[in-house]
Each structure stands twice: as structure tokens, then as C-alpha cells.
Curated annotation (Swiss-Prot):
The keyword S-adenosyl-L-methionine does not apply. PROSITE patterns: PROTEIN_KINASE_ATP (PS00107), PROTEIN_KINASE_DOM (PS50011), PROTEIN_KINASE_ST (PS00108), RCC1_3 (PS50012). One of its GO terms (cellular component) is ciliary inversin compartment. Interacts with PKD2; may regulate PKD2 targeting to the cilium. Interacts with ANKS6. Component of a complex containing at least ANKS6, INVS, NEK8 and NPHP3. ANKS6 may organize complex assembly by linking INVS and NPHP3 to NEK8 and INVS may target it to the proximal ciliary axoneme. Interacts with ANKS3. The lineage of its organism: Eukaryota, Metazoa, Chordata, Craniata, Vertebrata. CDD domains: STKc_Nek8. The active site is at D128. The modification Phosphothreonine is found at T162. This is Serine/threonine-protein kinase Nek8. It is an enzyme of class 2 (transferase). Residues 281-307 are annotated as: Disordered.
Length: 698
């Protein structure tokens, strides 16, 4: 809410509170709907998401304009246009028994007609059109329809099979259990027109059965005979019991009764009133007056050598180290004294989540402000510098997980909402476009679901819900989205799951994806180059014949290479051309390309069969992460090992390529536990937490 100033509460809707606010940038009054998502059911979340989705599609002067949505204090905030003239229902109520002029009725009616025509043109059903949802400008001359919470966007189906809306405006076919379609909105339009002409509802009764009986029989009092026969006939046609007999919107707009009012709308609304009477263009002809949107469980305590300890200086709550990208040894990143519980590395991003739920970012300082310059005669580049900052603009939002792709970031809140920001290339942000976004923005298509995890590849995203539903979006070539095609998508698509498999965790690679299921098995899709997904059907130490090699999978497929196909796997990660997995017993397996020794075997073998990493047999491993041509593994006691390509500091040591695991030394003087590790391209990010020697209370 940094961009807005609350003025007062103007209403309480079905799902939350409506605030009148001042937008600081231009001093414009706006309406902000505050919807407490933590108290909402899945259906209520879907309605809130639906209103955002519908309003973004619409752009019409007679439809309430949508500005943005964001999270604030555990609530979804939807900013939209403010209509200060109140509702049409209030306008009618204030008339008491003083009937409106027919010209005024038509002035309002044709604006509603234009708005509904715009809505239907976008294949949207309003489904709750009523005078309470029709708003007026400050002069009470311009009509704007709003409240699209239960609207229906029609895609492949032409009808909405749910009965919703206000009972007094429900059509006869809905009372019979038939589907809702455009003609049901036209019935509601007829109810609104009747209300304008009679100052009362067409159908009212003491109870619901009596109301349904009236609607089914089409029983309503005729409107006053002071109105033209054409207007009375229009009301009757709109309230025809048979949907087929109700005229379509285009026919209504073409009626002589409406044409003049429509012309006046386009010529008079917004015109400046003259102080003197206008002269007639033709003598003798009077002028018509103007119409009034952690990759694994933590490792246990790492025991460091017991040296002299200065108790006066307490250890930091946690430390985050980075190496690679020119950093040859682990660099402790600057940060406030807070505990970072999970980290994620992208092509250029370094991000973490604190225990208090804040998103922290590490960035290089602006050019010329840090890092020093290379002095004459120097043989080494100066140590790169980083500055930390908390992501601003998300007050009241608790982040519990972050994932990074190439130039974009996704984060998950404690309320199961996914937000993305950064580069919109390939549709990675999931907002239905390729537009870049600088601030975290809700992925509205997933508001109806409680999400529990999100993973980012270089150019695609997987997200998992609490009910085991899987969604994918972004670049799709190679089948990396698991949708059975190679098509790309810029908004979330539900992924079909293998029957009997319950997804527990998702992992994304450069051009592939994996799912860990509840029995500890793995499903994979995308590029299987070098058998980096383990999809080849292989027995132990067996090599496949060329025609048995699987090059790609368009849908999620169980692993076929022994021993991965029968081991219980706790952790997997995907590199550019290789992958690694940790079993329930703590063994570490690698598979894929071994060009740079990233598989951790004594020889640079060329094989498509998975192998167990050598040198780690006596150590129980709990985490593993893969970079472009190297691997990092974490032991149960906090040991950190790396192997593979050593260029530009990938291994966190000042040495060349290492085909076997070697330890990485961290600058820690207190016992610690590794809480999270993430590798991307040539970079590694690792978080550790200090462990005190005090006994843990029972």
C-alpha cells in the first residue's frame, strides 16, 4: 500500500472490505478491494482470481477499469476505478415514487447495453447483473458495470453449468437447472430495465419458492402507460420465458428506440456545457437538449575444529556463501543478523528467504561504486563485492520459498500464492504475456489453488499445489513442461499426472523437469541427452543399443535406468547435461555427461548408465545440487564436497577440474548446519546456520 493512502471504508462485499484510497502518484481516488485470502475457500479464491482475470480482459468506458493487484497484510488487494455517484440501486431508491423520464431511462439503459455487449464480445458472462452492481460517475450521467467476481469466461464450452447470481434476477432456465448463457444475462438486463421504469424489482416475493414460482410463470406488473409502446414491448421481449425469444444485444441496439440514445451517448457524454444557448443549425428546427494481474532438507550439525572461542562475540544467526562466476573460494555475503533458511541462484540472481518470511537479494553495486579497480601490475582481479537488500513493496507478505530462472524469479507466500517478477521472455512469469515486470506480481491463474512449491528452469516453471495438482508454463520445446507437446505457454497449464503417483516435489533443469513422488520415485520429462534423466531402460552397468536410447519425453515418465528405477530417492537436481540423486540410505548417484568429470568417477568414462559417486561411500549425503558442469553435495554432518569443471571458481577451490569429490572449506569458527544449497550455470549459493553447544530442551 506504499503507493496508496487509505481514506475510508466504503463497503463490505461478499469476500472482504472495500476501501476508498488516494493514489499518491497522481492524487486520483481509487477503490481497493481487500480480500483476506487466508480465510477463503478454494472456490472463494477462484472468485477473487476470476474478477482480476475478467477485469484485465475488459477495456470500455462503461466498465469499471482495473488497475492492479498485490498482496498486503495477508490479503489480496485489487485496485480499480472509483465511481463516486453510488449505485444505480441507490439512485432509484432516492427517486421514491417519482418515475424517471423515458429519455433518462434510455440514457442509462443504452450504456448498460454497450457495456454488456463489450463483455459478451470477449466471451464473458457477467452472471450477476443487477442495479447494485451498476455504478454512476459523480454527475450521475455515466454508467459503469462492475463486480465480476462470479463472471464466467467461456472457452471451448458455450454455457456455464453453475447457478449463481442474485435470486431476483435469475432467469427461468436457471430455475429449471439449465445452463447459463448469454440469454440469461439478457434476462437480467430486462430486470434492470424494468426497475428503471417502475422503480421496483420485476420479481419479488416473501420467500425463495414463491419467487421461483413468479419467475417461472413470468408474472410481473406492467410498467406505466406513460412510457412509449416501444419501451413496454422491449421490456416484454427481454423478459420472455423462452431464451430463444429474447433478442440478442445487437438486435436491441438496432431498435429505433435505442438508436437515438446511442447516438446521444457518443456525441453528448463528455461535452462541455455552453453558457449561452446554442443557435440552431437550421432555422425553425429546435436543437435537442443534451441528454441528461531450499532444494532439500537441511544437513545436521557440522562439527568444526575446536579452537579458542571468544564467547564475547556471538556467532551470526546464519551465513550465506557464494562461489563461481570468478569467485574461486566461498565468499560470505553481507547480510543483516537474520537467519536465512533457503537460497536460490539464477543466471544473475542471488536470493534467499529469511525465517521471518522476507525475501533478501544480493546484487553487485552500481558500476564505479564498489569492487575496486585493477591496479597496474596486478595479476588477479579484485574480489567482487555484493550488497544485500530486502525486497520492498510487499509489506505484510510472508515469503516461504524462492526459485530463480534466467533473469526471472518466482516466490511462494505462506498463504499458497505464487508471485513472479523479472524478464517475461518465453512467458516465464505466467501472466499471459511476455512483458517484463519489476515488482513481484501474483500469478492470477493460480489464485484458486493453495500452492506449496515452485521451481524454475532457465526458461520454464513448475508449481505444485497442496492437493497434488501440477502446473507448468514457459518455454516448452523438448517437452520440458510435461504437457505432451513442445508448445510454449505464457500462463499456467495443468499437467496430467501418472495414475497412482502423488507429486511431492518438483525440480526444473535447463531443458527438462522432474517430479519426486510419495513412494520416493521420480518422473521426468524433456531432453534426455546423455541419459541425464535416466529414462533409458538399463540394467546395472548395461549400455543401451542406439535404438533403445530415449532422447526426449514429452510427458512425465518413470525412470528406467538401474538402480534409480528401484531406489527410494530423497533428493534430485538437474544440471545442463547431467543430474544427481541422493537415496534414502545416503548414497549419491550421478548420470548424464561426464565431459568435465561432473559425475565424480575415477575415469572420464563415456556411459549412459548411472554411477555411484566415488569417495563418498562412507559419508551419508543429504543434499545435492548440479551446475552447468559441476556438482555440489552436502553430508549429514554438514560436509560440503564439489567436483567437475573448476574454471572460474565453480568448485569453490583454487584448483583445476576435479573428477572426484573434494571438500570445500567455509570460513566458519562455530559449529554449523547447512540449510540450503543451489547451483545455476557456474554459480553456487549455500546457506549455513550456527549451532550452539547448549543442550536442546526436551
Amino acid at each position: 500500500m506504499e503507493k496508496y493512502e487509505r481514506i475510508r471504508v466504503v463497503g463490505r462485499g461478499a469476500f472482504g472490505i472495500v476501501h476508498l484510497c488516494l493514489r499518491k502518484a497522481d492524487q486520483k481516488l481509487v477503490i481497493i478491494k481487500q480480500i483476506p485470502v487466508e480465510q477463503m475457500t478454494k472456490e472463494e479464491r477462484q472468485a477473487a482470481q476470476n474478477e482480476c482475470q475478467v477485469l484485465k480482459l475488459l477495456n470500455h468506458p462503461n466498465v469499471i477499469e482495473y488497475y492492479e493487484n498485490f498482496l498486503e497484510d495477508k490479503a489480496l488487494m485489487i485496485a480499480m476505478e472509483y465511481a463516486p455517484g453510488g449505485t444505480l440501486a441507490e439512485f432509484i431508491q432516492k427517486r421514491c415514487n417519482s418515475l424517471l423520464e423515458e429519455e433518462t431511462i434510455l440514457h442509462f439503459f443504452v450504456q448498460i447495453l454497450l457495456a454488456l455487449h463489450h463483455v459478451h464480445t470477449h466471451l464473458i458472462l457477467h452472471r450477476d447483473l443487477k442495479t447494485q452492481n451498476i455504478l454512476l460517475d459523480k454527475h450521475r450521467m455515466v454508467v459503469k458495470i462492475g463486480d465480476f467476481g462470479i463472471s464466467k469466461i467461456l472457452s471451448s464450452k458455450s454455457k456455464a453449468y453453475t447457478v449463481v447470481g442474485t435470486p431476483c434476477y435469475i432467469s427461468p432456465e436457471l430455475c429449471e437447472g439449465k445452463p447459463y448463457n448469454q440469454k440469461s444475462d439478457i434476462w437480467a438486463l430486462g430486470c434492470v430495465l424494468y426497475e428503471l421504469a417502475s422503480l421496483k424489482r420485476a420479481f419479488e416475493a416473501a420467500n425463495l419458492p414463491a419467487l421461483v414460482l413468479k419467475i417461472m410463470s413470468g408474472t410481473f406488473a406492467p410498467i406505466s402507460d406513460r412510457y412509449s409502446p416501444e419501451l413496454r414491448q422491449l421490456v416484454l421481449s427481454l423478459l420472455s420465458l423462452e431464451p430463444a425469444q429474447r433478442p440478442p444485444l445487437s438486435h436491441i441496439m438496432a431498435q429505433p428506440l435505442c438508436i437515438r440514445a446511442l447516438l446521444n451517448i457518443h456525441t453528448d457524454v463528455g461535452s462541455v456545457r455552453m453558457r449561452r444557448a446554442e443557435k440552431c443549425l437550421t432555422p425553425g428546427t429546435p436543437m435537442a437538449p443534451g441528454s441528461t494481474g531450499s532444494r532439500a532438507t537441511s544437513a545436521r550439525c557440522r562439527g568444526v575444529p575446536r579452537g579458542p572461542v571468544r564467547p564475547a562475540i556471538p556467532p551470526p544467526l546464519s551465513s550465506v556463501y557464494a562461489w563461481g562466476g570468478g569467485l574461486s573460494i566461498p565468499l560470505r555475503l553481507p547480510m543483516p543478523n537474520t537467519e536465512v533458511v533457503q537460497v536460490a541462484a539464477g543466471r544473475t540472481q542471488k536470493a534467499g528467504v529469511t525465517r521471518s518470511g522476507r525475501l533478501i537479494l544480493w546484487e553487485a553495486p552500481p558500476l564505479g561504486t564498489g569492487g575496486g579497480t585493477l591496479l597496474p601490475g596486478a595479476v588477479e582481479l579484485p574480489q567482487p563485492q555484493f550488497v544485500s537488500r530486502f525486497l520492498e513493496g510487499q509489506s505484510g507478505v510472508t515469503i516461504k520459498h524462492v526459485a530463480c530462472g534466467d533473469l526471472f524469479t518466482a516466490c511462494l507466500t505462506d498463504r499458497g500464492i505464487i508471485m513472479t517478477f523479472g524478464s517475461g521472455s518465453n512467458g516465464c512469469l505466467g501472466h499471459g504475456s511476455l512483458t517484463d515486470i519489476s515488482q513481484p506480481t501474483i500469478v492470477e491463474a493460480l489464485l484458486g489453488y493453495e500452492m506449496v512449491q515452485v521451481a524454475c528452469g532457465a526458461s520454464h516453471v513448475l508449481a505444485l499445489s497442496a492437493d497434488g495438482e501440477l502446473f507448468a508454463w514457459g518455454r516448452g520445446d523438448g517437452g520440458r513442461l510435461g504437457l505432451g507437446t513442445r508448445e510454449s505457454h505464457n500462463c499456467p497449464q495443468q499437467v496430467p499426472m501418472v495414475p497412482g503417483q502423488e507429486a511431492q516435489r518438483v525440480v526444473c533443469g535447463i531443458d527438462c523437469s522432474m517430479i519426486l513422488t510419495s513412494p520416493g520415485r521420480v518422473l521426468a520429462c524433456g531432453s534426455n541427452r546423455f541419459n541425464k534423466l535416466g529414462l533409458d531402460c538399463l540394467s546395472l552397468e548395461e549400455e543401451p543399443v542406439p535404438h533403445q536410447q530415449v532422447e526426449e519425453a514429452l510427458s512425465f515418465t518413470p525412470l528406467g535406468s538401474a538402480p534409480l528405477d528401484r531406489e527410494t530417492l530423497l533428493c534430485v537436481d538437474l544440471g545442463t547435461a547431467h543430474s544427481a540423486a541422493v537415496t534414502a540410505s545416503g548414497a549419491c548417484y550421478t548420470f548424464g555427461s561426464n565431459q568435465h568429470g561432473q559425475l565424480g568417477t575415477s575415469s572420464r568414462r563415456v556411459s549412459r548408465a548411472p554411477c555411484r559417486v566415488q569417495g563418498l561411500e562412507g559419508i551419508k549425503m543429504v543434499m545435492v545440487a548440479c551446475g552447468d558442469a559441476f556438482t555440489v553435495a552436502i553430508g549429514a554432518e554438514g560436509e560440503v564436497y564439489s567436483w567437475g569443471k573448476g574454471a572460474r571458481g565453480r568448485l569453490g577451490r583454487r584448483d583445476e577440474d576435479a573428477g572426484l569429490p573434494r571438500p570445500v572449506q567455509l570460513d566458519e569458527t562455530h559449529p554449523y548446519t547447512v540449510t540450503s544449497v543451489s547451483c545455476c550455470h557456474g554459480n553456487t549459493l549455500l546457506a549455513v546456520r550456527s549451532v550452539t553447544d547448549e543442550p536442546v530442551p526436551p
